[in-house]
Amino acid sequence: MSQNKTLTTASGPPVADNQNSRSAGPRGPLLLDDFHLIEKLAHFNRENIPERRVHAKGSGAYGTFTVTQDITQYTSAKLFDSVGKQTPTFLRFSTVGGERGSADTERDPRGFALKFYTEEGNWDIVGNNTPVFFIRDPLKFPDFIHTQKRLPQSNLKSAQMMWDFWSHSPEALHQVTILFSDRGIPDGYRHMHGFGSHTYSLINAKGERHWVKWHYKTKQGIKNLAPADAARLAGTDPDYAQRDLFGAIERGDFPKWRVCIQIMTEAQANAHYENPFDVTKTWSQKEFPLIEVGELELNRNPLNYFAEVEQAAFGPSNMVPGVGLSPDRMLQGRVFAYADAHRYRVGTNHQQLPVNAPRSPVNSYQRDGSMAFGSNGGAAPNYEPNSYADAPKQAPQYAEPALALSGAADRYDHREDTDYYSHAGALFRLMNDEQKALLINNIAGAMAGVSSDVVQRQLQYFFKADPAYGEGIASALGVSLN
């Protein structure tokens, strides 16, 4: 029989009594020299870190990415250098608008943030369960997220401000259509697709760049929750998706996704009739078919939620040689915003935490800061250039190829492309009658109580996408088409 562990303070000395505070006599006041009590209360006061401003409610798991098809003609990234090669991963799912204690069965996009622990460093693809987003320009992101949160005065959610924003943002229509479709409430995290959403880039050994979209196709099959079931679960089991994911992995029913890409050459992008870097639109799979890359499997639950899920930090700025960014405006905004959020929320040295630490060597000149641990660079120099032969040196061979740009610096109107409607209309026409009816009823229910001016403005967008789309919602809302 194993020996019992001795309880200690955070500094290591043993604790003699964890039941009774020190006091002046059995009925007297407590004593300030009870360092165990003081430490315990002080640490308790500081247990929470700021929750994520978005994607606060989340679940995570470790897994493995396995290469199934050769794509070395597109990328020199070493994790893809041979078929069958495996790379450890960590995947965090989430809702977007809700707080940490909210239900994970709400109608909301789901975050799909994937970290690859590669031999060249960490690579993150920070996506969602939808291929598009509500806005094109990160300048509008704080405004949009405010509409998904709570009113400043009452601290209540508001359909009015949500639809008011969308009715002034016609580019949101494609994502709105997806959100209120049957896929707007996935049945847990295992039964939904994932997407990188943004356009990224791949760079091969010749220095050639291709634009890429990432897709994760669930092998468990798509399953969604009916609104009534989702509402019931929100009251009876608000952690339904977390429970489902954790339980499946614990019993060995490991969820898997088929990983695919779409590829577009730079020449194709330059000549394309649509902006391939517009995250409110998808690429045609007829024009740019899916190419299988590999398989993602989740096979290990975290041992501690706070340490490994709450403190997990993902960012599109985490890249390895052979992958890169694109002129996608939202992606470029996220490159700053995500890393900055982690510095505020988790700390300056968040990359040193085990869940965020790369499995490859780290050789940088960054030093000190809050909660720096390990050797902190030891006695090595903390400046560059320097005269030390064994100090880290830049590696020009990993430079990305030049990207040709044109145009004067200005604030260009990102709404000059006025086609906000064709993609939403095409999606509506792909739906069967049952799916269309569900979409219309979901939207009409969500618009109940919204002011008539907002309803009228939003209805115009539905009509422009497809007359039947607009007519159905107008009828469900009891709005006269006259």
Swiss-Prot record:
Gene name per UniProt: cat
The UniProt record lists the keyword Membrane: no
Cofactors that this protein relies on: heme
Organism the protein comes from: Onchocerca volvulus endobacterium
Primary role: Decomposes hydrogen peroxide into water and oxygen; serves to protect cells from the toxic effects of hydrogen peroxide.
Taxonomic path: Bacteria, Pseudomonadati, Pseudomonadota, Alphaproteobacteria, Rickettsiales
Name of protein: Catalase
Family from the record: Belongs to the catalase family.
Catalysed transformations (reactions): 2 H2O2 = O2 + 2 H2O
Domain of life: Bacteria
GO molecular function, one term: catalase activity
